[in-house]
Amino acid sequence: MNQSFISDILYADIESKAKELTVNSNNTVQPVALMRLGVFVPKPSKSKGESKEIDATKAFSQLEIAKAEGYDDIKITGPRLDMDTDFKTWIGVIYAFSKYGLSSNTIQLSFQEFAKACGFPSKRLDAKLRLTIHESLGRLRNKGIAFKRGKDAKGGYQTGLLKVGRFDADLDLIELEADSKLWELFQLDYRVLLQHHALRALPKKEAAQAIYTFIESLPQNPLPLSFARIRERLALQSAVGEQNRIIKKAIEQLKTIGYLDCSIEKKGRESFVIVHSRNPKLKLPE
């Protein structure tokens, strides 16, 4: 299997690599699979701990490595990744590779540029932020993806969202290394363009941020979205009643900022979100 670079995927559907990437200070490209699975979730009220194991077999089955090696059991394991820090850091990682990883899967850039790409304000460029990013890169590194063939594991491959994350404050340098086998997740049919407007309009509102990334990754005219499915996506650890309250509040926040036009309908004991329209640029209805 030949090594690939993120440019091979992001540029595969355009005529010239001179065309500006859609990954910039206002947009990020993200794999649909990661946005629909409970990979980046709200921070729990108690200790983070480990996330529940996520079955990604269906979502990752289209990857070349899964097809070529016959992997039929794919799991995502590791630490819980939150929206307020870890997703921001992940956005910075994708920005960095889209800009500097056109011919290499190991890249370097200034810590200041990376922090800005993550969305952290320049006034926070201090020792506390360096520690925050250091710990976040560690969690991304430890978020494992395990491919297995057969119940008795006749073959397997272990990787993660990030292979290496290293930085030197004295040199103002950050180094990142990614697994090229995962770039395929960014193919046109499997990626979503997320605009930062909604994330910026929802500071510290992690449930609303997570639901935004989920709903934005859905196709046009999506089917009614059950609260049970949203609870699964958010991976909250509170009682079901409290989770439903959090979901309703988050939906209202998405409506308030002008992103979502929807209604909530109850069928039996289950509630459903009916999406009427989405506006990533947050234009409030007149």
Swiss-Prot record:
GO BP term, pick one: DNA replication initiation
Pfam family, one: Rep3_N
Intrachain S-S bonds: none
Signal peptide positions (record): none
The UniProt record lists the keyword Iron: no
Membrane-crossing residue ranges in chain numbering: none
Taxonomic superkingdom: Bacteria
GO MF entry, a single one: DNA binding
Keywords: DNA replication, DNA-binding, Plasmid
Function: RepA is essential for origin function, autoregulates its own synthesis from the promoter, and, when overproduced, blocks origin function.
Similarity annotation: Belongs to the initiator RepB protein family.
Protein name from the UniProt record: Replication protein RepA
Organism: Escherichia coli
Taxonomic lineage of the native organism: Bacteria, Pseudomonadati, Pseudomonadota, Gammaproteobacteria, Enterobacterales
